[in-house]
C-alpha cells in the first residue's frame, strides 16, 4: 500500500527551541554505541582500555562524526554554496551531513586518540566498527522521518509519497508537491487515489535496513570471535561500500545531478574506494595474527 509521508520532523518544542527527530536519532545513536561498547570493553576487545578510556574515545569519535559530517557535506555536496556563503558551515539546523565526511572525521579522531594512548589504530577501528551500524540505522530513520534523501519514482506497492520531493525525476528546478498544493489538498488527492504516480522508493528505509540492521548483525556476530587485525574494519568498509553503491540506484542523486554516464552518483563514487579498501584490509588480515581478548584493566591507559 502506498503511504503518504505526514510525519512532523519536529519531535517537540521547548519554548523557542524546536527539537528535531534527526537530532534525537543522533542522541540515540551515541547512547546505543556507549551501551554496546561497554559490552565489548568488558569482554576485553580493546587491549588495555577500560570504560573511562572508552568514554574518552567515544567523545572524540562523536566530535569527528559531527564536525567531519558537516564539513564533508559542504565539500562533497554543497561546495559552490559554501564558497558563496562560508557561514553555511555553521547553520547545522538547516540539515546537511555526509557519511563519508563523518567517516574521515572519525578516522582522524581515532588516529589522534590511538597515538595519545599508544595503541595500534586498527585495533581501535576493529573494536569500534560493530558499533557504527546502529548509528547509521538511526540516522537513516531520521532521514525518513524528516522526509529527505528520498528515492526515485516507483510503481511498487510500498512506495511513499513525499510532499517535499520533486514532482518528477528530471534533474534540477522541479517544483515539489507542497509547492503546488497545501497539505489538506495533498491528503484529499491521496485519499482519492490520485497521487500513486508520485510514489517514491523509501530509500532511507532500505539503507536503515542494510547499513543499519544487516551490517550490525553481521559485524557483531563476526567480531564475537577473535579475528586478525584489519578483518572487522575491512568487513565494515566492504559491506557499507557495496550496500551504499546498490541503494544509490534507487535513490535520487544529490542535487538531482548524476556525475557520469547518466547514472553514476557522487555517493557511488565515494563508496567505490571503501570497497577497494575493504578488500585490501581483508588481504592484510590474512597476513596478521589473531588477536586474543584481554580483560579490561581497572585503570585506563
Swiss-Prot record:
Protein's job: Catalyzes the transfer of the diacylglyceryl group from phosphatidylglycerol to the sulfhydryl group of the N-terminal cysteine of a prolipoprotein, the first step in the formation of mature lipoproteins.
HAMAP family the UniProt entry points to: Lgt (MF_01147)
Stored NCBIfam families: lgt
Assigned EC number: 2.5.1.145
A UniProt-annotated Pfam family: LGT
Organism: Xylella fastidiosa (strain 9a5c)
Record bears the keyword Thylakoid: no
Class of enzymatic activity (EC top level): transferase
Record-given protein name: Phosphatidylglycerol--prolipoprotein diacylglyceryl transferase
Family to which this protein belongs: Belongs to the Lgt family.
Membrane topology, as annotated: Multi-pass membrane protein
Subcellular location as annotated: Cell inner membrane
